[in-house]
């Protein structure tokens, strides 16, 4: 006789329901349990002086090797030289570089304005002192050897200033007064007459007057001569100083020497000279300046440097530049030009620069040190956070797979009883 068909005993419902439920629960929490098993315990446990197996957890026990593997993975696949070059190009775009340079220039100007210790002024003063006192003299000494040294500049100064130079009426009057009061006062003229009328000079004048005159003047020269007259004049100038000075003063006034000198000085200009003379004078002036700069220019600039307070000049210069609208408005243009120069340089040498920067930055060692210095608890919390925030689908998938496995077990159990 055939065996009677077995029926499912629904009184044992928990045997059919528990596998899917338990499988889903186990599958859902397996990831968290696995992560905790990788990290726990954080430290080694010793019993009777012997370390308990599997303590500490797998990751704390091999944290240094893990750090090295993470560093190798990142540097080998994520932060490759090509990727770093792309990153550098994005960071060093012209607009960003220009903005950074502009910010630095503005910061420098603000720093100069608020520089109470005058450090910037001292630096600029040192630069100016070295430039004017040391570098410029050597440069001028070399340039002065050229035949055309400052030729155009000296010619321009000569043509536009010296050639057009002419004293005004007031200037000519003051210069004439100075000439008659300081250079040639009556006492100086008197002394010049005395010095001029020596016995030898008087003899020469007298003989020349006798030989070269004719007619009535010859009779006067040979009968009376000039020796006695000139001798008496010299004696009078020596013995009667005050009277001589008064006579000379009256003579200057009667002859209107002051007005004569004023007119001469007022009409004195290079334009009245012949063209050939002016050209020769201009050439002589140029050669004189060149020769002076070549021989004595260094000493002149050195003495000038020693007599100038460069710190005050530098401070005035910096204050003027920091408040100049032209400088402030040109910062953007300067930053743009510098950014373009840097861009052209980076286009050519970026690969070499990145190759040099990578060892300097030691990114791989930074990653290793950072992972090694992170406590196992912090690593565990970080991985759990990533799993919960970014890998939640895997957790849910684990629960679903556990549920499916439990359903298969229930189905197998049901079919095995039939």
Swiss-Prot record:
Q: Which UniProt keywords apply?
A: Cell inner membrane, Cell membrane, Membrane, Transmembrane, Transmembrane helix
User: How does the record say this protein sits in the membrane?
Assistant: Multi-pass membrane protein
UniProt keyword annotation of Signal present:
no
Domain of life per record: Bacteria
Q: Which InterPro entries match?
A: DUF445 (IPR007383), UCP032178 (IPR016991)
The record's subcellular locations are: Cell inner membrane
- Write down the Pfam families for this protein, in alphabetical order: DUF445 (PF04286)
Keyword Methyltransferase listed: no
Any transmembrane segments, and where? 10-30, 394-414
Gene Ontology cellular-component terms for this entry are: plasma membrane
Q: Which family does it belong to?
A: Belongs to the UPF0754 family.
Query: What is the protein name for this chain?
Result: UPF0754 membrane protein alr5253
Lineage of origin: Bacteria, Bacillati, Cyanobacteriota, Cyanophyceae, Nostocales
């Amino acid at each position: 006789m055939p065996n009677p068909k077995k029926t499912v005993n629904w009184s044992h419902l928990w045997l059919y329901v528990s596998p899917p439920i338990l499988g889903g629960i186990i599958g859902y929490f397996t990831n968290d349990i696995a992560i905790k098993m990788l990290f726990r315990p954080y430290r080694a446990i010793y019993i009777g002086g012997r370390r308990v197996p599997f303590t500490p957890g797998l990751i704390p026990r091999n944290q240094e090797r893990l750090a090295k593997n993470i560093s190798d993975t990142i540097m080998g696949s994520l932060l490759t030289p090509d990727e770093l070059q792309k990153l550098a190009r994005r960071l060093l775009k012209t607009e960003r570089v220009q903005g950074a340079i502009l910010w630095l220039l503005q910061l420098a100007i603000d720093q100069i304005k608020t520089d109470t210790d005058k450090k910037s002024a001292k630096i600029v003063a040192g630069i100016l002192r070295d430039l004017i006192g040391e570098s410029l003299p050597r440069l001028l000494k070399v340039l002065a050897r050229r035949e055309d040294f400052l030729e155009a500049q000296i010619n321009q100064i000569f043509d536009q200033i010296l050639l057009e130079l002419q004293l005004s009426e007031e200037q000519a009057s003051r210069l004439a007064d100075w000439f008659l009061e300081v250079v040639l006062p009556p006492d100086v003229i008197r002394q010049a007459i005395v010095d001029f009328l020596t016995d030898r000079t008087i003899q020469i004048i007298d003989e020349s007057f006798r030989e070269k005159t004719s007619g009535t003047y010859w009779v006067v020269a040979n009968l009376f001569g000039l020796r006695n007259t000139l001798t008496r004049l010299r004696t009078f100038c020596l013995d009667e100083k005050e009277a001589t000075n008064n006579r000379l003063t009256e003579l200057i006034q009667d002859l209107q020497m002051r007005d004569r000198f004023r007119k001469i000085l007022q009409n004195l200009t290079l334009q009245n000279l012949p063209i050939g003379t002016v050209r020769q004078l201009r050439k002589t002036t140029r050669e004189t300046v060149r020769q002076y700069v070549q021989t004595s220019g260094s000493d002149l600039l050195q003495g000038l440097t020693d007599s100038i307070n460069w710190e005050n000049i530098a401070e005035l210069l910096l204050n003027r530049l920091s408040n100049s609208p032209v400088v402030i408005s040109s910062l953007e243009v300067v930053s743009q030009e510098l950014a373009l120069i840097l861009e052209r340089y980076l286009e050519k040498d970026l690969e070499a620069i990145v190759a040099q920067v990578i060892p300097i930055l030691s990114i791989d060692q930074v990653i290793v040190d950072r992972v090694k210095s992170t406590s196992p608890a912090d690593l565990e919390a970080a991985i759990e956070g990533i799993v919960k925030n970014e890998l939640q689908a895997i957790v849910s998938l684990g629960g679903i797979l556990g549920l499916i496995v439990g359903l298969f077990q229930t189905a197998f159990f049901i079919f095995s009883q039939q």
